[in-house]
Amino acid sequence: SESYTPISGPNGYXVDVK
């Protein structure tokens, strides 16, 4: 599933696809 983690990423969040 796609887990959206509020950490450093392209738009202020990181998209962690597991």
Curated annotation (Swiss-Prot):
It comes from the Eukaryota. One of its GO terms (molecular function) is carbohydrate binding. N-glycosylated. The lineage of its organism: Eukaryota, Viridiplantae, Streptophyta, Embryophyta, Tracheophyta. Keywords: Lectin. Lectin that binds galactose, galactose-containing sugars and gentiobiose. It is strongly mitogenic for human T-lymphocytes. The keyword Membrane does not apply. Homodimer. This is Lectin.
